[in-house]
């Protein structure tokens, strides 16, 4: 590889007439070799004592010189791994030969006698491009900084002459990187504080499921004791507070069958109604007037067990009594006539639900006008042979 690089530089020097065999040029080369000796001693590795490659020292010398024409080479940005052991052995074996062939090329453009830095840049770029395309291995001149044992540092994608720009660029981005997270953290902290305050406030106002269950139980007991129906409560809420609720909604609230959200909305309204009803108990208030206006049907009458037993015994004798019988029965039981009539209607409907299809209903013989002993659907039974 070193021989190939040397041949290319010999062709380049002969074609471009860059090499001049004048005494001044030889003195410049000699001074360059002395400088290289000093640079080589400065860049000796501390781990194994082997100096860096001559090509890398040449890159370092150019980066600190005045010309520095290789700073804009596109191949200097590439991270190319050479064959470490073979390249290092060849470079150590032929270091003096490369210095003698490359010294005039390196020193000459610094004085600018025939070619300026632009010519060196264009010629060097063309030469390195041709070598990169023809040779399978990477170029030694475009290698970045080496670490121990000649391995390429994976973090150094650029040459050493770009360290200053790269460091300043990293510092600039580092400042922005530190500023952006700090601003983001401040915004997140403010947002979390707002959310935390909101959640604390909502948690204090929102009742738990146990609170709702306890309130529903107390509300039902107080409502029944005060003598109001579920429909009365729904109508009173609509008239007093502007939210009309049906009897079904109040029933589902007492049975804990509403959603948690709807239970939480309905609880404060029912609590206000309950407080007003408790404070006005014993005197006619607006709630009583509203309940009286809203009642389209009578209250449900609760019948005592003894009275219900007397009605049951009379139903077994006559499921459908006449009007005179209903009146006499109501007077004997101290009930309203309408209450007794409704009770017999409901009892007959219950008996229909309890009787299987094709069965008989107690008292049906009276409906059809037959005697109790011989129902119409029962005839003389004959044995089947």
From Swiss-Prot:
One of its GO terms (molecular function) is DNA-binding transcription factor activity, RNA polymerase II-specific. PROSITE patterns: HOMEOBOX_1, HOMEOBOX_2, POU_1, POU_2, POU_3. GO terms for cellular component: nucleus. It is found in: Nucleus. InterPro entries: HD, Homeobox_CS, Homeodomain-like_sf, Lambda_DNA-bd_dom_sf, POU, POU_dom, POU_domain_TF, TF_POU_3. Pfam families: Homeodomain, Pou. Expressed in the developing brain and spinal cord. Also found in a restricted region of the auditory vesicle during development. In the adult, expression is restricted to the brain. Residues 296-355 bind DNA. PANTHER family: POU DOMAIN (PTHR11636), POU DOMAIN, CLASS 3, TRANSCRIPTION FACTOR 2 (PTHR11636:SF115). This is POU domain, class 3, transcription factor 2-B. The lineage of its organism: Eukaryota, Metazoa, Chordata, Craniata, Vertebrata. The gene is pou3f2-b.
